[in-house]
């Protein structure tokens, strides 16, 4: 699984048989994108470098800003992944951090402890490694992510197929599609009775975290409000009308020749 996200492995000529559409990014190349075309590394990599005993390093993901921190309910759960699921391995979710700054020799090489404080500071926490690297070996402080980025890949097509079959009340067919993905991940297969919409949404986290546009998935499946209230402690006040965004007033005002009402709940 982790091989798909290693630098230079995203394209089919490199042997990646799961990629469907890959954004082509080339470091220091005209037309290859700059530091801001793909912000995923800055968003997903912890600010470990801001913790005493650490220094910027390509193998730790470079200069992350930790703008997106995974919720503890899944990434620190003991039963969210099967014990054999490779998507939960250290290669894919970094849970062990070791001090690497030679200027603090008393700490160098020792394990760093993840605590509620390091999580609240966004410095040390279990981190998704999909967005590590990306030309950071040239300059660990480089803010961009010029690693080619997969936008569509085969696993998601199977999960979309499973979603469609669930909506058709074809649980056996949904389980069959989900199991294609789980077999590749060395996870146990599921039965038709387990192929629910909630299981599918959990499977999309296991497979596609950081890749899918999660809000769109939850809106499409009618689960935005329910799962936000259940799993996001900071957004318990979400309401059904929040399924839609408010329409900017400038857009409403520009439609002078037609009635253009605001979405419900925002008047």
Sequence positions of predicted segments:
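Short, cationic low-complexity segments
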Residues: 38-68
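Flexible, polar/acidic helix-loop-strand segments at domain edges
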Residues: 59-153
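Charged alpha-helical initiation segments
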Residues: 123-137, 176-179, 183-186, 205
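Long, intrinsically disordered, low-complexity segments
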Residues: 1-47, 141-151, 175, 182, ...
């Amino acid at each position: 699984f982790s091989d798909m996200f290693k630098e230079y492995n995203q394209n089919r000529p490199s042997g990646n048989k799961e990629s469907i559409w890959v954004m082509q990014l080339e470091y220091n190349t005209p037309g290859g994108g700059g530091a801001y075309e793909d912000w995923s590394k800055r968003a997903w990599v912890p600010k470990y470098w801001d913790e005493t005993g650490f220094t910027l390093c390509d193998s730790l993901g470079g200069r992350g800003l930790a703008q997106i921190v995974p919720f503890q309910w899944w990434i620190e759960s003991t039963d969210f992944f099967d014990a054999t699921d490779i998507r939960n391995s250290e290669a894919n979710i970094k849970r062990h951090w070791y001090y690497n700054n030679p200027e603090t020799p008393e700490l160098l090489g020792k394990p760093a402890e993840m605590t509620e404080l390091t999580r609240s500071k966004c410095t040390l926490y279990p981190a998704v490694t999909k967005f590590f690297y990306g030309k950071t070996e040239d300059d660990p402080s480089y803010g961009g992510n010029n690693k080619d980025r997969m936008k569509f890949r085969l696993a998601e097509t199977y999960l979309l197929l499973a979603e469609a079959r669930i909506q058709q009340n074809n649980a056996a067919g949904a389980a069959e599609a989900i199991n294609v993905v789980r077999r590749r991940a060395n996870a146990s297969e599921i039965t038709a009775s387990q192929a629910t919409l909630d299981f599918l949404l959990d499977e999309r986290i296991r497979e596609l975290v950081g890749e899918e546009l999660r809000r769109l998935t939850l809106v499409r499946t009618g689960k935005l409000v329910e799962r936000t209230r259940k799993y996001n402690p900071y957004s318990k006040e979400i309401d059904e009308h929040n399924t839609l965004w408010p329409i900017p007033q400038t857009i409403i005002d520009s439609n002078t020749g037609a009635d253009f009402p605001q979405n419900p709940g925002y008047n």
